[in-house]
Each structure stands twice: as structure tokens, then as C-alpha cells.
Amino acid sequence: MRRETRRTGVFTRRALITMGAQVAMLGGLGVRLWQVQVANGARYATLAEENRVSARLIAPPRGRILDRFGEVLAGSRLNWRALLIAEQTADVSGTLDTFSRIVPLADHERARIAREVQRHRRFIPVMVREFLTWDDMAAIEVNAPDLPGILVDVGTTRMYPFAEQLAHVVGYVAPPNEADVADDPGLALPGIRVGKAGIEKTHDHALRGRAGAVQLEVNALGRVIRELDRDEGVAGEEVRLTIDAGLQQSLLARLADDEAASAVVLDCRNGEVLAMASKPSFDPSLFNAGVSQAQWNDWSRDKRTPLLNRAIAGVYAPGSTIKMAVALAALESRIVSPSDTVFCPGYFDLGDARFHCWREGGHGTLDLRGGIKNSCDVYFYETARRIGIDRIAAMGHRLGLGTELAIDLPGARTGLMPTREWGNAQGHHWSLGDTVVSGIGQGYIQVTPLQLATYAARVATGRAVEPHLTRRLAGTLQPGSQPSAWPDLDLSDKALHVVREGMWAVVNEPGGTAPAAKLPDTRWQMAGKTGSAQVRRVSREQRESGTFDSSKLPWEYRPHALFVAYAPYDAPRYALSVVVEHGNAGAAAAAPIARDVMLDALQRDPGSRDDKPTAQVALRESPR
């Protein structure tokens, strides 16, 4: 009996202890539930929401680039792509292995993806593959459960309707490099492209726009259930150029037979660039996904350098096109008058050196107008000797040669108008012989085709015309395209008149050096000047043999052919330059091209037709 009572007491104590523990546990849980649901309810609700809502930035549509009449030069089309969000998979390598069995990835693609995953925060999507086909997307979706972290998305990619025809002007975009992302972390977004050349680079920030964001509901595996909210961001600004795409096509068609050439057409009145061609060219869309090493090697090995914009970065001796600058320098210095004459026997002796005229028998006695019309080398040897290199250089700069122009394109070169001071700085003792050959555009002088067109426009108008390519930015007419009087060059009307008369005679008068440039439409007359720039020295033996023919030399040893012009002669509207590399003679190779292009410009008359801004609409295209 006593033993039974003792057992009952032990049981009762154990029950009480157990019951007390249970009460304590339930009490603790109750307190915790109160803390979670009441005291900290708002905080935990937010955490729960973040666990099921994924916010992702989206790249904004890049702004369009248009010609002056609204023709699309650079636009956008849809681009379906596969992205990887590293934070949504525990095994990035395993996910990529599975993806590669569905859509094959090359080793260099895997390496790039790995670098980008390491470089960026894990919630930032990384591009796995762009330009997916319908079959690719279907296969990815079917295998979605085995592809944690993979998301099929749609963005945009750049398209260039005129491809090679405007590649050097419009430029191209490419994926941002590490330096780009370091400057702007927002460029890490998949599908973002940055301007790397041409107008795409000049106006890159305006064309980029502002990134948007999308809120997505996702499941535990990170798969999208539905879209909750979307901010499209702000599309890039629209850029309207001064270019007339129709005139550009006409110009390129005229250059089709030349291996390497360039040409520029300007509106004399405001400096608008209406056409700018550089041949050979390239397809700018190849840069969208990054150029392959094989393609880059092909371009690098091509002696014609297709990536070079010859119009702004090709430098050439101007040859006889320099003679208007020499003439104006002589007239403005009052050392030479329009009526002063020089006798040309076909050569010019300076000490022991003999400098030859292009015309073997000489031109006889010529005044300044006749010197320009006949492009007499001896006349300009003597004129250069009398005025000196510094006056020639100063006038060249004044007319836009060998100096920086305000063109809105990256990579423009300044060329060179040498002076005595420049020669001394180079360790070269400037000689009178250097000055003499400079008088016919040989020696150290270097100019670009854009400078030559600007030079022609300045001679035509007597004003400091500056070339430019941007007509409207975000719908606003740019200052350079607004009707305005460019600063006067402060050249005498008499000097300009005699030089212009000489240029008119070159084209329109019997005996001029460019009869092939005469316009067939009698409503207009063109004034111009031929030029041929040697790329190698002609020896005395070759010259004296009488059998030397530069047209029979290998292509790369032939002289460059140049021509500059403006029209109409009596009321200048358009100026141009044509440079045919190794074309041998400006009169034969460049002048006929200039004639046809100028005629087309006058007939189209783009500078007299106003443009009308158009609404921005992204061009769309289905997957391939």
C-alpha cells in the first residue's frame, strides 16, 4: 500500500513537469506568432513578397538615326535571347551544360558567360545566347524544369537598312567592354549596346535612353508565373542627319568601279553634309554580337582598309587642287597681281634642281587666271617661291585645309599645312625647294576629302563654312543647320573673283584641264579644279626616257586622282570633293564622277527641301 502511494506520487510529479513544459513551449510559440503576425507583421509580409517577386531592369530601345527626309538609317528589331540569372541556380555550370545540349555553346561563349557571372552581381541577368529561333525557344521552354536560372526574354538589336552604304557615317554599336561598364554600371544589362564609331558614338548618350524595369512573380525555381508591373523606361532620342540617303546611293553607285575612293558633298550655304562616301566599306551589323576574330583578321589584312572613313581620316597630298589657296595667298599679300605673268617652258630651275611642269612642252606665258585654268606647275612654282611657305600655310588654314574642322564624327584627322616653324620642330631645315613643291600640292602637305570639300565651299562663298552632319536632335533643329551667315573670310572680292574665274575656265573653257566635268544641263555651270598627287618619285631617267606611263604602274604606285568643285557658278549651292586612290589623273578619274554627282545634287536639290520630323517607331521582326 505504501509502495503504491509512492508510485502515484512519482507519476503525478512527472505529469506536472511534462504539462508545465508543454505549456511553456506553447506559450513561447504563441509569443513568437504574436511577434511575427502582429508586432513585426509588416516586415515579414515584405520579406515574403520579395521572395516571390523578382524585379529586373530592361534595356531601353535605342533611338533611331534618320536621314534629312526621315529615311531610317539605324533602327531596332526584336531580338529573342536566353539569359542566365545566377542567383536562381545553385549550379551555374550544370545549368549551362544542360543548355548546351539544347542550344550548343562554343567554348569561348562559355568562358564569356563565366566571366560576366563573376563580374556582376548575381541578380543581374547575363546573356547566354542572342537571336534565338522559334525552334530554340520551344526547346528551351520544354526543358525549363532542367534549366534553373535560364530565362527566355525579348529585347532589341540594331539594324542598318543601308548597311555598307552609310557605315562610316552612321557607325555601329557593340557590346560594352569592361571600361564602358566601369564608367556606367547600367551598361551591364543584357542587350545593351554602346556606340563605337560614327554618329552612333557621337550621340551615344542621347541614343541610349533610360532603362526601365519589370516586376515578375516567380516560383521557388525562379520560373516566371506572371508579370506584375512594367516601366518601359525612356527610348533614346531620335537623331536626324543632314545626309540625303538618295544622293548617298547615287554617289556610291558612281564610285562602284574604283577600288578605294571617297567623296563629300556639302551645302555651301550652311555646311550641311549631304553625302559622304568612303570605299571600300563594311557591314555595321556584324558588330552587334561582337566581331569574330576571323572577320577582324580579314579586315586587318585588307590593304584597302575598309574600316577607315577616308572622307575624314584619309590624308592625301592635294596636288594641283591647292593652287587656288596659293593664288589667294599671293593676291592677298599683294606680291602678285592678277595680271602678272610667268613664262612656262615646261620646267622650273632652282639652283641645280629642275622641277617639271606636267605639260612637257610648257604652257608659254600665263597670267593667274590662265595658270589656274591650265593648272600650270611652273606658274605656281614661281608664285610659291615669291610668297613663301608661311603665307601658303596661313591661307590654307583659312580655307579649311590642314586644320581641325567642327565635324560631328569621331576620328577626323587634321592633316598638315607645313610652315618653317613646323619644319624646324621636326629637325628638318626648310628649303626653298620644299616651298616650291608645296606650291603644286606636293611635299609635306596633307589634307582630307572633307577639308577639300570645305575648301571648295569657302572659295565659292567667301565665308568660313563649317561642315556638320547633325540636323535635328530630339526634334530640335541644330544651330549649324539654321539659316545663318557664316563669318566672312575677309578676302577681297577681286581676289576671289579671279580665282573663281580660273576654276570656271578649268571646266567650261576650251583648253581647261577638266572638260569631262562640264555639266550637260545648260541651266547650271560648275567651277572646279583637278589634282593628281604622286605617291612615289619619278626619276630623271624615267622622265627623260619619254616612255614613262604612270597608268602602267602597279595600282598602289599610281598617283591619286582628285577634283574639287562647286555649282552653280553664279549662285553657289553645293560643293564637293572626289578622291580616287591611285586613280592616276584627276581629270580622267575624278572629274567625271564629280560631274555626275553634282548634276544629281542640283536636280534633287536636297538643301532647298525642308524636312518633317517623324514619330519614333521601332522596326520589328520575328525570330528567324
Q: Model regions: which residues?
A:
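Secretory targeting signals
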Residues: 1-10, 23-24
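N-terminal export leaders
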Residues: 13-17
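Hydrophobic membrane-insertion alpha-helices, especially the h-region
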Residues: 18-30
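Aromatic-capped interface at the extracytoplasmic side
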Residues: 33-55
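Short beta->alpha transition motifs characteristic of CBS
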Residues: 60, 76-81, 275-281
